[in-house]
Design a protein with these regions (language model features):
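Structural microenvironment flanking redox-active thiols in thiol-disulfide oxidoreductases
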Residues: 1-31
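Short, internal strand/loop/helix patches
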Residues: 27-54, 58-60
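Thiol-/selenol-based redox modules, centered on thioredoxin-like
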Residues: 61-136
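Short coil turns that delineate tetratricopeptide repeat
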Residues: 118, 150-152
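Alpha-helical linker/edge segments of TPR/alpha-solenoid repeat scaffolds
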Residues: 164-181
């Protein structure tokens, strides 16, 4: 929010996309933002941009071209003690890009295509989410399990399934996943 407010007069825009099914929780987290926050309950963005971790950012320029591909970045220092990641480096990179047209070195990174296992994992996740919405919890569980087997370190699958299965995406289960990552 702070960076958006700082740079919006320089034609800088933020669009947040929550890769989540819980609109109530996302709405609470989005309270007070003045930029759009969209919901992607079907994880389409993760497939389009090969996103496997959250939070991730994609920089898109005024010509609708990707200036920097998906990168794991944070917008707050809430979890700095856990992740060791500070927001300030990323924030300064954004300022330099907006004001000077300078891109960070990793902007030329080519995001590899999803592997066959990752594609299959995402399909299983989608099936599981659909089955869960239909009230078919047991069948959904089998597909969530298979998705996690195929892509065990994909946060957009493993962590995203936690609240859908009654787990806490910020609890012990998450920290176990984070340690593996």
């Amino acid at each position: 929010q702070e960076l958006f407010e700082e740079l919006q007069s320089e034609n800088f825009h933020v669009v947040a996309v929550a890769i989540d099914e819980n609109t109530e929780t996302v709405s609470e987290l989005a309270a007070g933002t003045s930029y759009p926050v969209l919901m992607d309950k079907d994880h389409l963005l993760t497939e389009l941009y090969a996103i496997s971790n959250v939070p991730s950012v994609i920089w898109i320029d005024e010509n609708n071209m990707i200036a920097r591909p998906a990168a794991s970045e944070v917008g707050t220092d809430t979890f700095t003690e856990i992740t060791g990641m500070s927001r300030e480096t990323h924030m300064q990179q954004v300022r330099d890009w907006v004001r000077k047209g300078v891109l960070p070195d990793d902007a030329s990174y080519s995001v590899p295509d999803l592997s066959e296992e990752e594609v299959q994992a995402r399909l299983h996740f989608r099936i599981a989410a659909h089955l869960r919405r239909e009230g078919r919890e047991e069948e959904a569980g089998a597909h969530f399990d298979r998705a996690a087997e195929l892509a065990p370190l994909d946060f957009t699958i493993v962590r995203a399934s936690m609240p859908l299965r009654g787990g806490d995406p910020f609890g012990e289960e998450f920290f176990e996943l984070y340690q593996k990552y």
